[in-house]
Amino acid sequence: MKEIKGIFKANDLAKYINYKYLNMENKIVKEISPLKLQKSLYFCFAYWGGFIYSGEKNKSELTSSFNKYLFDDRIEAWVYGPVVPNVYRSNEYLQECNPDEMFKGNEYVREFIDGILDDVLKVSDFNLVEVSHQDKCWKNNFNPDSLTHNNEIDKDEIIREYAREI
């Protein structure tokens, strides 16, 4: 069995994203779309990893105790941007989420993720797609001629790209 090196499983983080969306005020659509869920997962992973990686490079005490991988699940370059396939193929994110239990001992991680989600969940699905299509890690791995569109994106490549933005 493969050792999980992420803080969470992607499906658990997806449950939390869905929980946050369902508890948002003034949302236009009642349920989170698969596109918004996928882009939320991606941007949470990318910004968290970039933040921790840049802290490691600067020898920050704050970030040294955190894992740079929010989750260890595979991320692929699909037509509408980066996708976590095992989340896409399951409906686990619709299950109940207990945020207090999930983030026990990881309150700082929760605050960080909430900051990302407060912005990302307000943006339209296709604006999120547009933003993700600007990322070099997606551009370098997406093959429009492939019938499967499932090239894996290296997680460290994502993290390094976002570390430059921080």
In which residue ranges do the predicted regions lie?
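Domain-edge interaction signal
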Residues: M1-I166
